[in-house]
Swiss-Prot record:
Listed pathway(s): Amine and polyamine degradation; ethanolamine degradation
Name of protein: Ethanolamine ammonia-lyase small subunit
Chief subcellular location: other
EC code: 4.3.1.7
Entry's cofactor comment: Binds between the large and small subunits.
Organism encoding this protein: Escherichia coli O17:K52:H18 (strain UMN026 / ExPEC)
Length: 295
């Protein structure tokens, strides 16, 4: 699927919602304003700010314009300079700050108030707390008994597409991207004439939990939106795992189709929603997912 096809899908979905389609997006790293090469370091600089991310620490560069262009082209840690064999103080502090931010988003919980404000049914896996979630991934792949009963009682049975949201390893990925991905996703699926199940939130869920959900509800396609394991300085990245007719006993990882890096600096959430709608339609047409799909 090329960029032109993606933009056409986005326009179609947004038109059905009565909204103007966004202009073609570019990754944030392409528009970052870079600071000029500097020789001094400020302890007052906010290490999470755009200014800190654009900081160039190479002293007395031969071609400052080349460093500026390189810094604009990537979010990688380039042009940070050295102090002998060691990184400069600001580069090291920013590394530690980004590492701390990534750890924080793994350990944070999605507030119950936020889930209620979105009008989502909340269920959970067999996990009872974050520590157990991190040490027992196998328990995050199964729903607790109360969750099974809640889904049977409150969710639409036998949908064409069932959308599930889970915190995964990044709370920020869910709370930051939710408003921009779920409404256009649901609207696009309904516009396509598909029977859409009741969206709900699974606390402490792992990817494979979608197999049990699909089996319980009789869903043809299950779409799981889950927080990705955060990288350094990027804690808002969301993934979509889609699978056709999942079964706990027989579905393997190769049966899943994954769309990753969904965030404003990667694949924009609205654009991802349009791609997921198209993916769900093709899964239903081909009655397959993962490596079994024909491209």
């Amino acid at each position: 699927m090329d960029q032109k096809q993606i933009e056409e899908i986005v326009r179609s979905v947004m038109a059905s919602m009565g909204q103007a389609a966004p202009a073609p997006s570019e990754a944030k790293c392409a528009t970052t304003t870079c600071a000029a090469p500097v020789t001094s370091e400020s302890c007052a600089l906010d290490l999470g700010s755009a200014e800190a991310k654009a900081w160039i620490g190479v002293e007395n560069p031969h071609r400052a314009d080349v460093l500026t262009e390189l810094r604009r082209s990537t979010v990688a840690r380039v042009c940070t300079g050295r102090a002998g064999p060691r990184p400069r103080t600001q580069a090291l502090l920013r590394f530690l700050a980004d590492h701390s931010r990534s750890k924080d988003t793994v350990l944070k919980e999605v507030p119950e108030e936020w889930v209620k404000a979105q009008g989502l049914l909340e269920v959970r896996s067999e996990i009872s707390d974050k520590n157990l979630y991190l040490t027992r991934p196998d328990m995050g792949r199964r729903l607790c008994a109360e969750a099974v009963e809640a889904l049977k009682a409150q969710c639409v049975a036998n949908p064409d597409v069932q959308v599930v949201i889970s915190d995964g390893l990044s709370t920020d990925a869910i709370t930051v991207n939710y408003e921009e991905i779920l409404p256009p996703l649901m609207a696009g699926l309904k516009q396509a004439g598909l029977k859409v199940g009741t969206p709900f939130f699974v606390r402490y869920g792992r990817v494979k939990i979608e197999d049990q959900i699909g089996e319980i509800l009789g869903a043809k396609v299950v779409i799981l939106l889950v927080g990705e394991r955060p990288g350094l300085g990027q804690s808002e990245s969301l993934s979509c795992y889609a699978v056709y007719s999942p079964r706990m006993a027989t579905t393997v990882e190769a049966d899943r189709t994954c769309i990753s890096n969904i965030h404003q600096g990667g694949t924009p959430p609205v654009e991802a929603a349009a791609v997921i709608v198209d993916l769900a339609k093709r899964m239903l047409e081909q009655k397959a997912s993962g490596i079994n799909m024909t491209r």
